[in-house]
């Protein structure tokens, strides 16, 4: 699973996800991409599950790019713990994804396989997605 090697701060504030993506809205590497239609926080586990589903469908042919990185530490307190006494330990890492952001790209496979792989990857994510083609 993806996680940052080094962090400037151990814990982060909750923050909000931007409504529209300012960058990363165009396909940069591959021929097909998976674009987000909602804004959401995606965990490293969800990214890994989507990657595995897509790569398995592609039968390890072609190339697959992940365009988002889970750099935000999300902390959580144990259940049935009283208020106060600190923020809680880091539970997982997440990436903030805005509307219009390209999440994954792939290349080197036929259009049918690419669409099927990206549909499987999109089913693993908590956002509505759409498959886009380069130059479309």
Swiss-Prot record:
Q: Which Gene3D superfamilies match?
A: Ribosomal protein L10e/L16 (3.90.1170.10)
Subunit annotation: Part of the 50S ribosomal subunit.
The species is: Orientia tsutsugamushi (strain Ikeda) (Rickettsia tsutsugamushi)
Q: Its family?
A: Belongs to the universal ribosomal protein uL16 family.
Q: Which InterPro entries match?
A: Ribosomal_uL16, Ribosomal_uL16_bact-type, Ribosomal_uL16_CS, Ribosomal_uL16_dom, Ribosomal_uL16_sf
Keywords recorded for this protein, A-Z: Ribonucleoprotein, Ribosomal protein, RNA-binding, rRNA-binding, tRNA-binding
Alphabetized SUPFAM superfamilies for the sequence: Ribosomal protein L16p/L10e (SSF54686)
Q: Does the keyword S-adenosyl-L-methionine apply?
A: no
Q: Which GO terms describe its cellular component?
A: cytosolic large ribosomal subunit
The UniProt entry, under NCBIfam families, shows: rplP_bact
| Pfam families to which the protein is assigned, alphabetical | Ribosomal_L16
What domain of life does the UniProt record list for this protein's source? Bacteria
Q: Quick one: which gene encodes this?
A: rplP
Q: Which GO terms describe its molecular function?
A: rRNA binding; structural constituent of ribosome; tRNA binding
Q: Can you say what this protein is called? A: Large ribosomal subunit protein uL16
Please list the GO biological process terms of this entry: translation
What function is annotated for this protein?
Answer: Binds 23S rRNA and is also seen to make contacts with the A and possibly P site tRNAs.
């Amino acid at each position: 699973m993806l996680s940052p090697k080094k962090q400037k701060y151990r814990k982060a504030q909750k923050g909000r996800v931007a409504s529209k993506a300012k960058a990363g809205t165009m396909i940069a590497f591959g021929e097909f991409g998976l674009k987000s239609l909602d804004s959401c926080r995606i965990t490293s586990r969800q990214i890994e599950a989507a990657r595995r589903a897509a790569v398995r469908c592609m039968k390890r042919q072609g190339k697959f790019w992940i365009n988002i990185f889970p750099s935000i530490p999300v902390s959580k307190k144990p259940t049935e713990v009283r208020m106060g006494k600190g923020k809680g330990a880091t539970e997982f890492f997440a990436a903030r994804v805005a509307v219009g952001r390209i999440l994954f790209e792939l290349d080197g496979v036929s259009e049918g396989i690419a669409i099927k792989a990206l549909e499987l990857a999109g089913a693993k994510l908590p956002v509505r997605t759409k498959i886009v083609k380069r130059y479309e």
